[in-house]
Regions:
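N-terminal pre-P-loop "Q-motif" helix
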Residues: 1-6
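Non-catalytic alpha-helical coupling and interface elements of nucleotide-dependent molecular machines
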Residues: 66-74, 152, 247-251
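The catalytic "switch" region of P-loop NTPases
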Residues: 123, 133-228, 233-234, 248-252
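The conserved phosphate-sensing helix
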Residues: 235-247
Length: 253
């Protein structure tokens, strides 16, 4: 599954992983992060950590997003080429201005991010989890529009290698969640996204593999093939249900 998703990243795709809650999206992103670290600078963000105030104005969001980017680079990536360090320092200096720079727009932010991409010695991949937390905000849609513009112009301007959004809803369908009088605001800012067709559910074989590991430790004598088939039939491979049923059988039966 991670290998399939990485193929999209290697191909430079921007895409959305939208699945029901507890479908393994966050776990998959973490596994993908570990898998890509050697080849890319991977920046992993979570919009659940952004407060509602950070989506109130464009400048607040731009400052918060830039700050999160810098924190990720400082925490997970220790050494950078000189030009890249200069780009990071320029962005750091910009968001350190006090009082808060109300003229720091998304367009300005993406100018700094473009400089960062140009100076990096490895391509940069952005992963953003829980984008549903931001989906009712106009600032978020403006942010998507900037990503779209960056993607379209990347043959002439530096851009992220790949952008991965994760959440319950497909951001292409945000219009459905908004009041009719606001519909004029939306023009499919994420229509550049590649279709995400990777199956996130467990196959019967994957369930059997987990049961084999359990059987090797506990020697229950179960028929692994039959049990895997039963679990798959009952859950359709929904990761949370598979894990929960296995937990209940382990603890209560």
């Amino acid at each position: 599954r991670v290998r399939e998703i990485k193929k999209l990243v290697n191909a430079g795709k921007y895409f959305m992983i939208n699945r029901a809650r507890q479908y393994g999206k966050t776990t998959t992103l973490r596994a993908l992060y570990r898998n890509m670290m050697k080849d890319y600078y991977v920046v992993s963000l979570d919009f659940q950590t952004f407060g509602s105030a950070e989506f109130e104005t464009e400048s607040r969001f731009a400052n918060s997003f830039a700050d999160s980017i810098l924190e990720e680079f400082e925490r997970r990536h220790r050494e950078f080429p000189k030009k890249m360090e200069e780009s990071l320092e320029n962005l750091r200096r910009k968001i350190s201005e006090r009082p808060l720079n109300e003229n720091f727009t998304l367009r300005s932010l993406f100018g700094y991010l473009g400089d960062l991409c140009a100076s990096a010695d490895k391509p940069i991949v952005i992963m953003i989890d829980e984008v549903d937390s931001a989906s009712n905000n106009q600032v978020f849609l403006d942010f998507l529009a900037q990503l779209r513009a960056q993607y379209i112009d990347r043959d002439i301007q530096p851009a992220f290698q790949s952008v991965i959004l994760a959440g319950v809803y497909d951001v292409k369908n945000l219009k459905r969640k908004l009041r009719p009088e606001e519909e004029h605001k939306y023009n499919s800012p994420w229509n550049i996204a590649a279709e995400f067709t990777v199956d996130m559910s467990f196959s019967k074989e994957e369930i059997a593999g987990m049961l084999e590991e359990y059987e090797a430790d506990y020697h229950t004598g179960m028929n692994i093939n039959d049990m895997a088939q039963w679990l798959y039939n009952y859950t359709s491979g929904y990761p949370f249900l598979v894990s929960r049923l296995c937990q209940l059988m382990d603890e209560r039966i």
